[in-house]
Amino acid sequence: MLYRYIAVFLILGIGLVENFSSTQPCWAETLVQSTVETRLVVGLRVGQAAVQKLVPTPWQVGPPPGGPLKDANFMFVFIDQLLVQDPQGKPDMGGGNRYVVFSVPGKHTQTGEMAPVVTGGFTPDIRNVPGPYKVSVQGTIKREQTNKGANTEAGVSDDFWEIRDTRGGSIEVRVQYQQALPLRAKAEQKIYSAAEPSFFRIYRTETATDLLRSIPAGINRVQNYQLRVTMPELKNLFDGSEQLVGIIAYPLFLRQIFLP
């Protein structure tokens, strides 16, 4: 069933799968970084008016019209970077990192382009503040993950993330799920900044994608899901009316990052 949705949800949960060999960029590019990561993406539906305030003109909120994250208008993207390399292949910024990104699926009102807009995030490394998108702040990030399996059978994973800001606010998420064969695919996409609406970076990725839960698609291999958000800047989004749309795990996420 997962393969029916191959073109819906790769980069930040809403990318478009493409074949790199058939994609010829129309702009000059400069490689700035390469990474090896694992990720967890939680797609949610929150109040449209509240989330629109996070997105600058000329962007507006543009939830996916179909697929496993249909109508999701806010994404938590939890990223565990196992290796970070500069353009010469040397360890960059310490060589590893963990952080969380807040992403809103956007639609450009003038061009019609649809792309993720990064509206915020947390990083433990002050060197990454405010980050390339000028929206990241410093916080502490903890991840606890266990995987249990035997022989050739699919295993069971327990993934817990805790993010704390300097004022005592937190984001906590736990997902326990039955693993399945992941979908391997490639994607390319531009991702924009809420702080500088015209700024973008170009991402080329190769991923192994495990769709854990999709309410629109009727898929559910999640045995336990908990999300708790107490950060003041997110209180208008998480007022008790938010709804889960889907959860995606990326046991492997390889990417190259370019500037135009």
Please give the residue ranges for each predicted region:
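Aromatic- and glycine-enriched beta-alpha-beta binding-site module
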Residues: 83-163
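Generic structural hydrophobic/aromatic packing signal, biased to beta-strands
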Residues: 14, 42, 76-79, 102-104, ...
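Bacterial N-terminal signal peptides that target proteins for export
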Residues: 1-9
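C-terminal segment of classical bacterial N-terminal signal peptides
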Residues: 14-24
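N-terminal domain-onset segments
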Residues: 27-82, 212-244, 250, 257-260
